[in-house]
A protein has these predicted regions:
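Conserved donor-binding/catalytic core segment of Leloir-type glycosyltransferases
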Residues: 4, 144, 180-208, 219
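Carbohydrate-associated surface elements
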Residues: 149, 170
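Nucleotide-activated donor-binding/catalytic signature segment of Leloir-type glycosyltransferases, i.e.
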Residues: 231-247
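Short hydrophobic beta-strand element within catalytic cores of glycosyltransferases
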Residues: 275, 284-287
Length: 357
């Protein structure tokens, strides 16, 4: 079975995140299951135009526009048995316009919900309009999504429920596992430093607890457009806050493992990848009760879902007092999600849709 996956980024892209992790983890496991796996993506300028990454034959085109213009060419060149159009960046690949074969659409989340404050009003309206066109572009094709939230968003857009399949992501349970916590209480924020992720709240939470927890420490990892703004907030403060920037995956796993509580403030998620990695590491999360996150945090089990920023303080203090129970429950929750299970679900779906139109 030959599969062609269109996506805007791959695992080696400097801005790769949870979405690209899914492509990589699923893709390399599909290869082991005998799939001839092709990935067509965008070259940020510093990567090879072609290379094989753990069995995934990766073609990179310079520029988003050129990548989209190459869809027909790549379909003819590779002649796949099944196609995946990955919608992590909203702009559709429109593969059904160039092939009669079944196209599977990988819908991550509704971008319209996270656009305010990220792009100008005109661009926000354009992206929102494009998302509303999905039912027309991908009429009668299968949509795969990861969460109940995203499934409901698709139905709201006009996609038939019978054309939607939920395949949750997995987590590397060997890399992300419980371990010894730091001697002093260490809070963690890890993820993109963008406005809709609201990482600035991490500093607010730290300040709320500063006089209650001795030697309290906060670690903020990741990169993004508001990094300098966050640093500016604390430059004259005597806070124990470290900005680590973008770090490698193994180092990230170690930091998550040793932290006491993971903080999450995003406006919305398709699926909370970081929340699942934190849970696997025995590190509970406190997060806002927002779309996508509600699928990844079970209230009062592997963390807490709250309605406003002022609730973070009491929930963190409660977790600290009941640390061992939350470590145990967090790991138990994550053990339901493995990349092997996710890849098998993808394999069965793809296999059932080859030449089945």
């Amino acid at each position: 079975m030959k599969i062609l996956w269109f996506a805007h980024r791959d695992i080696k892209h400097p801005k790769a995140g949870g979405a690209e992790r899914t492509i990589y983890e699923v893709g390399r496991r599909l290869v082991k299951l005998g799939v001839d796996m092709y990935l067509v993506t965008v070259n940020p300028g510093n990567l090879l135009n072609y290379e094989v990454v753990d069995g995934i034959k990766t073609y990179r085109t310079k520029g988003n526009i050129r990548a989209h213009l190459n869809v027909r060419k790549m379909l003819r060149r590779i002649e796949p048995d099944a196609i995946i159009d990955d919608m992590d960046h909203a702009l559709p690949w429109c593969s059904p316009w160039f092939t009669n074969k079944r196209v599977i659409v990988f819908f991550r989340h509704l971008h319209a919900r996270s656009l305010p404050g990220q792009v100008n009003i005109v661009l926000a309206k354009i992206i929102t309009f494009i998302e509303k066109m999905y039912p027309s572009i991908y009429k009668n094709n299968i949509f795969v999504t990861e969460s109940n939230t995203s499934e409901n968003d698709l139905i709201h857009l006009g996609i038939k429920k019978e054309n939607i399949i939920r395949i949750p992501p997995g987590v590397d349970l060997k890399l992300f596992h419980p371990g010894e916590k730091t001697k002093i209480v260490q809070l963690l924020y890890f993820g993109g430093l963008r406005k809709y992720k609201r990482p600035g709240y991490a500093i607010k939470v730290y300040e709320d607890l500063y006089n209650e927890i001795k030697d309290l420490k906060l670690i903020i990892t990741g990169d993004g457009p508001i990094l300098n703004e966050l640093k500016e907030k604390i430059k004259d403060k005597n806070y124990n806050i470290d900005f680590l920037g973008k770090i490698d995956y193994n180092t990230l796993a170690e930091i998550i493992r040793e932290s006491w509580v993971n903080l999450h403030f995003s406006v919305t998620e398709g699926w909370g990848y970081s929340l699942l990695e934190s849970s696997a590491s025995g590190t509970p999360s406190v997060a806002f009760r927002v779309p996508g996150v509600v699928d990844t945090v079970k209230n009062d089990y592997n963390g807490f879902l709250v309605g406003n920023i002022n609730e973070f303080r009491s929930k963190i203090l409660y977790i600290i007092k009941n640390e061992e129970l939350f470590i145990k429950n967090s790991r138990k929750f994550a053990e339901n999600y493995t990349w092997e299970k996710t890849a098998k679900m993808w394999y069965d779906l793809l296999n059932n849709n080859v030449d089945n139109r």
